[in-house]
């Protein structure tokens, strides 16, 4: 499996501190992979929340594809972690892989419908809306994307006399 987000955050802090100490301007370029063996919708939703909270907006996300000779490939084909012999969930359906990928790019309006579907399936309807923790806006009643007009925003409506 992959390390959790806390490990990445610790690495990022150490990386930044070392570069500041050395007077270097180097940046981390993260590589995101969706549908990795062991990743359920729950984990993909948690990663989307982490990305939201850390202002991470990946332009490119790669779906997991088995590569010969790797532990992840063994998990993909067998459904077991070869080191622990514990069963591992492996997302294989086109629909779930698409939802996991969309979650990592939840800010892209083209992904909103799939993200809403994933959030509902994952029991996280609380992340649909307009609040600070929402990942996507609700669907409009006609199924089309809603665009906020100035009058839709608080304090921007028609003046009352």
Tell where the protein language model's regions lie, with residue ranges:
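Active-site/pore-lining binding-face segments in mid-to-C-terminal subdomains
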Residues: 50, 56-68, 78-89
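Radical SAM enzyme core and accessory elements
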Residues: 71-161
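Flexible loop/turn segments at secondary-structure boundaries
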Residues: 35-41, 67-73, 136-137
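Intrinsically disordered or highly flexible coil/loop and linker segments, enriched in small
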Residues: 17, 21-25, 57, 70, ...
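Conserved AdoMet/S-adenosylmethionine-binding subsite of the radical SAM
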Residues: 1-63
């Amino acid at each position: 499996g992959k390390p959790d987000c806390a490990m990445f955050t610790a690495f990022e802090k150490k990386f930044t501190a070392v570069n500041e100490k050395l007077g270097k301007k180097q940046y981390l370029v993260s590589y995101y992979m969706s549908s990795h063996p062991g990743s359920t919708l729950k984990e993909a939703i948690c990663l989307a929340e982490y990305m939201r909270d850390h202002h991470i907006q990946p332009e490119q996300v790669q779906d997991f594809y088995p590569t010969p000779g790797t532990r992840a490939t063994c998990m993909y084909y067998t459904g077991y972690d070869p080191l622990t012999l514990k069963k591992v969930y492996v997302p294989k359906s086109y629909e779930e892989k698409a939802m996991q990928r969309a979650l990592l790019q939840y800010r892209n309006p083209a992904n909103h419908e799939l993200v809403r579907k994933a959030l509902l399936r994952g029991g996280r309807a609380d992340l649909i809306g307009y609040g600070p923790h929402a990942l996507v806006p609700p669907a409009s009643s006609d199924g089309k994307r809603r665009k906020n007009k100035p009058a839709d925003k608080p304090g921007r409506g028609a003046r009352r006399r």
